[in-house]
Amino acid sequence: MKNTYRASNISGFNWWGTVIGFILSTSNRFYIGWFGIFMFPLTGLAIIAYVAAFILAPPVDIDGIREPVAGSLLYGNNIISGAVIPSSNAIGVHFYPEWESATLLEWLYNGGTYQFVVLHFIGGVSSWMGREWEFSFRLGMRPWIYLAFSAPLVAATAVFVFYPIGQGSFSDGMPLGVSGTFNFMLVFQAEHNILMHPFHILGVAGVFGGSLFSAMHGSLVTSSLLAETSGDVSLNVGYNFGQEDETYSISAAHGYFGRLIFQYASFNNSRSLHFFLAAWPVIGIWFTALGVSTMAFNLNGLNFNQSIIDSNGHLINSWADLVNRANLGIEVMHERNTHHYPLDLGL
């Protein structure tokens, strides 16, 4: 049953009651809600600032050594190489709004735009998740929609907020661009060896497994639609929006898949099936976010990066050794100054 908030519920019926009724009404074509009051301005400011910085921003002194890096289209980048450059290492993790700098140019030079975009974006996306919960609550629905959306939210928060805080500087955050994303991935691998971490492995299983399961489910449903029309008419014509009857035969899909693999590999309960489809990728991404958040503080005890030694103390070459050597190479190339050595090579 709809839990609709109407202006008539407010005594006196004044203009404020009309506004509240409009915000909380579930009859609107586009639901706003209390969280929407925060979501729209925060997300809008983040988008406007990102587009402006991607096109126009001057170079940013990301390393804090007076060697600014250009990321905008105006300074010669393209769609692939362009990015919003993270805040300067000289700023660290300090909150750096525009009024903390002497001039706007100084704020831009120190990468204040990055903090502006990231913090407004995280706030806007968090408000979106809260809006999902609020809308579900007012419609009398279960809260699983917002819970599923928490996976990409915690992943973004881990990369843009937790990791820079743990490393001591927003300059370690992920640049907001295509090539910047890959650069962040390579540096993260070099410094933390995330590919050999079990939480990352669970995340990969969640994402790729979720894609596989969704494709399997969609193909099984599409292949077992109940025909309500003649052979020369599309099956879609026989479907009426909101109909109570099922549109496909889950028993046929269950029987097909059970014989294709084995009986217990398929679901005979639609609710269990769809819960599994939602839970698998969400839990995997949760673990990835947890792995990034722990590595942010250099807590890496679960990593499988130890060399294999036999009983005589001789090294048995393994894939872990190859990855470790590759990590050292990436880390050396990442350091742009010869007087800055990677921690692993420092004596």
From Swiss-Prot:
Lineage top rank: taxon: Eukaryota
Cofactor info, note text: The D1/D2 heterodimer binds P680, chlorophylls that are the primary electron donor of PSII, and subsequent electron acceptors. It shares a non-heme iron and each subunit binds pheophytin, quinone, additional chlorophylls, carotenoids and lipids. D1 provides most of the ligands for the Mn4-Ca-O5 cluster of the oxygen-evolving complex (OEC). There is also a Cl(-1) ion associated with D1 and D2, which is required for oxygen evolution. The PSII complex binds additional chlorophylls, carotenoids and specific lipids.
TM stretches of this protein: 31-48, 120-135, 144-158, 199-220, 276-290
UniProt xrefs under InterPro entries: D1/D2, Photo_II_D1/D2_sf, Photo_RC_L/M, Photo_RC_L/M_CS, PSII_D1
Record: residues binding pheophytin a: 128
Cellular component per GO, a single term: photosystem II
Residues binding Fe cation: 217, 274
GO molecular function, one term: chlorophyll binding
Record keywords, A-Z: Calcium, Chlorophyll, Chloroplast, Chromophore, Electron transport, Herbicide resistance, Iron, Magnesium, Manganese, Membrane, Metal-binding, Oxidoreductase, Photosynthesis, Photosystem II, Plastid, Thylakoid, Transmembrane, Transmembrane helix, Transport
Site feature location: Stabilizes free radical intermediate: 192
Binding site for chlorophyll a PD1: 200
Reactions it catalyzes: 2 a plastoquinone + 4 hnu + 2 H2O = 2 a plastoquinol + O2
Binding sites annotated in the UniProt record for a quinone: 217, 266-267
Function: Photosystem II (PSII) is a light-driven water:plastoquinone oxidoreductase that uses light energy to abstract electrons from H(2)O, generating O(2) and a proton gradient subsequently used for ATP formation. It consists of a core antenna complex that captures photons, and an electron transfer chain that converts photonic excitation into a charge separation. The D1/D2 (PsbA/PsbD) reaction center heterodimer binds P680, the primary electron donor of PSII as well as several subsequent electron acceptors.
The family this protein is said to belong to: Belongs to the reaction center PufL/M/PsbA/D family.
Protein name: Photosystem II protein D1
